[in-house]
């Protein structure tokens, strides 16, 4: 690829297009209506890191002397100077990859968009690229695995996305230069480990060494190549794009992305840490959520495993969340005007782990009954009641969330209210205090009429009463290890 010519094309599109590389211009780009209908997405952390099956930062940590990953690597594969991270690439074969089967599982689980990792911090591209030979079409699987997956997802009616974690590659392999390893100078643009810069303690807005124009131009071209090759309608950026040096390149990319996708129904950027000014794109919280409902759209991305984003066999990493907890997260996020991007880590042979499949089947079973409280719904006047409080912020999904039968999340649709009980009561009795009888006083309490109450998934007529304390619903013999949804028909 002629890089200079590609840059000229990018700038020409931005000069002639509706959107220009300024925050003022980019802030006029709306979130498309189709995105407002999304509720559940599938995130896929796949790549070379799935071969050692440790966790997704293995490529960095194996070059930190004394780290658990370094010790593990030396014990199982030898010294990094003899067997580096790049030497895992031939074992990343994806020989059993069946994208059609994957997409079928995702759709049955209620997912309506998909975001595979295009390139992670390690610098290996999971798609066909003309900017680097270190990609899945030329090495490892020798297949455009992302392209093949997106084709099947589009056929199944899923909205296509992609994620870029490339910018952290600036320093991700830098520790490999601190001792005798396979990462050494000279390194040049196009080399796998390049630039492998020193990693400072504070990787944030103004951390040094500052990314160079050469590196950030390469970042820009890689992002634009993903757009031009696959036209993803959602592009997710991981952290560190908030760095001050990245901002002009973010503007150029966002303008190009918005302009290219303008005739294709629009697009959305997911970002973290206020990398974009508020109102441009959709903010994302990693492994966490907000404590209260928000008037703006937002996203929570989390993984089915607590200790890793990628496939892992390490006992302290491959700790799976229970399906009940995942559904509770979905209900909590949707009730607060959010979307849940749920991550799975495929195996290096292209299959999904048995536990992943089990979770997807459990989600499918629950969504088959309760989808109407998720898709097509909006915010109710309150989003929650109950004693259990969510710890707000990122990396909070390890905090205890012992939901009780007194905890509810609310959505509404077509004049109906949906009250999801986060933990099915053992005595079969629900007491929804937000729907109690109330007078028309100055207090902002709900004063509507309840005509009928249904328990989704329970064919029996629900017995219910309403008084000044609560709406009381008797589930009878109905029991479930998953959240139970009550549909309240109002007038």
Q: How would you label these PLM feature ranges?
A:
Residues 1-491:
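Mature catalytic domains of secreted/periplasmic carbohydrate-active enzymes
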């Amino acid at each position: 690829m002629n890089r200079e010519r590609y840059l000229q094309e990018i700038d020409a599109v931005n000069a002639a297009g509706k959107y220009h590389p300024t925050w003022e211009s980019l802030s006029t780009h709306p979130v498309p209506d189709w995105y407002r209908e999304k509720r559940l997405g599938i995130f896929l952390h796949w790549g070379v890191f799935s071969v050692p099956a440790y966790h997704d930062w293995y490529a960095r940590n194996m070059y930190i002397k004394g780290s658990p990953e370094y010790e593990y690597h030396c014990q199982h594969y030898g010294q990094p100077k003899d067997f580096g991270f790049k030497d895992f690439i031939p074992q990343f074969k994806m020989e059993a990859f069946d994208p059609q089967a994957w997409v079928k599982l995702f759709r049955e689980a209620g997912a309506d968009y998909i975001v595979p990792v295009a390139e992670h911090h390690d610098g290996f591209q999971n798609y066909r690229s003309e900017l680097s030979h270190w990609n899945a079409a030329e090495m490892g699987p020798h297949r455009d695995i992302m392209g093949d997956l997106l084709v099947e997802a589009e056929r199944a009616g899923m909205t296509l996305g992609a994620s870029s974690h490339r910018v952290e590659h600036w320093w991700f392999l830098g520790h490999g230069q601190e001792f005798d390893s396979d990462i050494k100078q000279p390194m040049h643009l196009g080399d796998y480990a390049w630039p492998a810069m020193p990693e400072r303690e504070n990787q944030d807005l103004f951390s040094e060494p500052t990314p160079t124009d050469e590196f950030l131009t390469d970042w820009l071209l890689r992002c634009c190549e993903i757009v031009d090759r696959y036209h993803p309608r959602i592009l997710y950026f991981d952290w560190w794009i908030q760095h001050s040096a990245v901002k002009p390149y973010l503007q150029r990319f966002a303008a190009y992305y918005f302009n290219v996708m303008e005739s294709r129904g629009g697009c959305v950027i997911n970002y973290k840490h206020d990398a974009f000014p508020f109102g441009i794109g959709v903010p994302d919280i990693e492994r966490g959520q907000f404590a209260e409902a928000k008037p703006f759209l937002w996203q929570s991305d989390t993984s089915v495993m607590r200790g890793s984003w990628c496939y892992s066999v390490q006992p302290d990493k491959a700790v799976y969340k229970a399906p009940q907890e995942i559904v509770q997260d979905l209900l909590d996020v949707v009730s607060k005007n959010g979307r849940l991007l749920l991550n799975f880590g495929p195996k290096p042979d292209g299959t999904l782990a048995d536990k992943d499949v089990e979770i997807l089947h459990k989600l499918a079973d629950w969504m088959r009954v309760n989808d109407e409280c998720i898709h097509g719904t909006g915010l109710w006047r309150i989003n929650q009641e109950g004693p259990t409080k969510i710890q707000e912020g990122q990396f909070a999904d390890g905090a205890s969330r012992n939901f009780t039968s007194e905890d509810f999340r609310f959505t509404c649709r077509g004049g109906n209210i949906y009250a999801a009980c986060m933990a099915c009561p053992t005595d079969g009795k629900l007491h929804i205090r937000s729907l109690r009888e109330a007078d028309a006083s100055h207090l902002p309490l709900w004063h509507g009429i309840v005509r009928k109450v249904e328990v989704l998934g329970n064919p029996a007529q629900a017995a219910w009463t309403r008084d000044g304390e609560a709406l009381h619903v008797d589930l009878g013999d109905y029991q479930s290890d998953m959240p139970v949804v009550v549909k309240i028909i109002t007038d």
